[in-house]
From Swiss-Prot:
Active site, UniProt feature: 187, 237, 307
SS bond list: none
Pathway assigned to this chain's UniProt record: Cell wall biogenesis; peptidoglycan biosynthesis
Enzyme Commission number(s) from the entry: 1.3.1.98
Function text: Cell wall formation.
Gene of this entry: murB
Class of the enzyme per the UniProt entry, highest EC level: oxidoreductase
Catalytic reactions on record: UDP-N-acetyl-alpha-D-muramate + NADP(+) = UDP-N-acetyl-3-O-(1-carboxyvinyl)-alpha-D-glucosamine + NADPH + H(+)
Name of the protein in its database record: UDP-N-acetylenolpyruvoylglucosamine reductase
Domain (FAD-binding PCMH-type) ranges: 31-208
InterPro entries registered for this protein in UniProt: FAD-bd_PCMH, FAD-bd_PCMH-like_sf, FAD-bd_PCMH_sub1, FAD-bd_PCMH_sub2, MurB, MurB_C, MurB_C_sf, Oxid_FAD_bind_N
Amino acid sequence: MNQTFVKSVTEQLPQLGLLQDEPMKKHTTFRIGGPADYYAEPDMSRISKLIEMAKACDMPVTVIGNGSNLLVGDKGIRGLVIGIGKGLSEIEVTEAVAQDFTAQDNCHIITAGAGAILAAVAAKAAEASLSGLEFASGIPGSVGGAVVMNAGAYGGEIKDVLIDATVLTADGELKTVTRDELDLSYRHSIVPEKGYIVLSARFRLTPKPKDEIKSYMAELRAKRVEKQPLEYPSAGSTFKRPEGYFAGKLIMDAGLRGYSVGDAQVSEKHCGFVVNKGEAAAADVLTLIKDVQETVLKQFGVKLEPEVKMIGEF
């Protein structure tokens, strides 16, 4: 235990609710992961101070969103883990004004905290009869995570509607970064390499009849239920889409449907997903991923790159 850090937090941020030895399986959709030394979900008023305290104690800081694209090692994460959650989950709809550089005819803006669930933002947009985020209606991740990885599905991506993001820099300064400056591409942004922490994002949307928006969103959700293994914990798509191929089909054609290591399994419903059938360990998932990569490379000459982010000690 880092007594200096705990004492500082207790005295200066008494309402924070700092947790010690917090199981990370409680904070990932994979339901896998060992303990974080310290875990907290600060709001906007506390996050900068908390990071400052951790740095003063030479403590590493890891920031996560909804944990929907993470595999945390069985030995957990050293230092402080900051969960961007309910304290940063506000969603606000406004109409763009003429002096706003984003303004277009009938353009509206949704501002969402990084902890807001992307699907909830899409639902809020639909209720306001605003189109552009339909593709996100079934994405379980947070706004912050979606910006970091330029989340997308069914032909839509965050970069299609993002205006800018407010971030906390590695120096502890608030900064607004435009979509172009974020250098968004397939499952990529400059956020990790710059050491930014996304605090909020603004999206540009356009009016459309509410029933049309909701009908299309319902159609996409039905496709997800039909094709994806939502009945089991997972981290979503395990591998990035290799150019010219589909990861799931390559894995299926390699004869790996249902392949298991412990309770980690290549989904029988969609081979692009690795699922946790019960008590899978991170080591099981890691071994399975490597086995799949080796088999697909050997059979088809295609190197699969993991989409799931691996953090912590394995």
